[in-house]
Amino acid sequence: MLKVTTLTKAYGKKTVLDQISFSVQPGEIIGLVGENGAGKSTLLNILATLQKPTNGSIHLHDKLCQKEKQSIRKAIGYVPQDIAIWEEFTVEENMIFFEKLAWKKLEIKALRQLCLDMALDKWKEPVKTLSGGMKRKLNLAISLIHDPTLLLLDEPTVGIDLKSRKEIGAYLRELASAQGKMILYTSHDMDEIIHLCDRIICIGDDPFYEEILIDSGKEILSF
Ligand SMILES: Nc1ncnc2c1ncn2[C@@H]1O[C@H](COP(=O)(O)OP(=O)(O)OP(=O)(O)O)[C@@H](O)[C@H]1O
């Protein structure tokens, strides 16, 4: 379980995240929404242990993340907004490269299966020839190499076509329900958020998001 308690982040005098508390159970997909600059990426960065909170605590599987950073990182898969893969390498070479950096080792067959699971079959193609959607799928596959229990996805489907979005959504649902992964997911696509997520966290002062989600039937937490 992930437990976030009264988490606050300030940059100088500006408080971006103010006393945020929530928990995530295995198998849950949580949507994070809010206007540009509301603090969604900041929250994901803090959960990924890449930034320190100003106050508050985060526990993952009962371990305090601020204290046990190294072991906590093994349980986290993080896909930032910007695609971070080698353009000149093939899909296969990228997967092998990142497998070498991962703490858990996987056979090539298993690496390939990770890509196939999300309908990415261009194994021998250079990444520079892939579409944006395929690159996002590869980024996601890379984040899964070490079999994390917590997946943090910052706009994983931005700018990609409906079919690829549906494929990624279906795969995330499968990861949550079949493998019990906890997924935190940001998107500006409210239909996608409503369709995919079990619960939704609205960040920021603007009530706009809460208002348009109110009829979704989903549990909404606002901060
Ligand atoms: N290193 C930093 N120093 C100072 N301010 C920062 C820093 N990083 C982010 N901010 C500010 O914190 C606020 C939240 O930024 P963040 O990127 O988390 O928002 P976001 O909700 O992810 O936005 P978007 O939807 O545009 O991706 C913004 O006002 C941003 O300018």
Task: Tell where the protein language model's regions lie, with residue ranges.
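H-loop/switch region of ABC-family ATPase nucleotide-binding domains
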Residues: 187-188
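Helix-to-loop junction immediately C-terminal to a conserved catalytic motif
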Residues: 48
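Catalytic Walker B motif of ABC-type/P-loop ATPase nucleotide-binding domains
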Residues: 151-154
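The feature captures the beta-strand-to-loop junction immediately N-terminal to the Walker
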Residues: 33-35
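Conserved ABC transporter NBD signature motif
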Residues: 56-64, 71-72
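Helical segment within the ABC ATPase nucleotide-binding domain
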Residues: 166-178
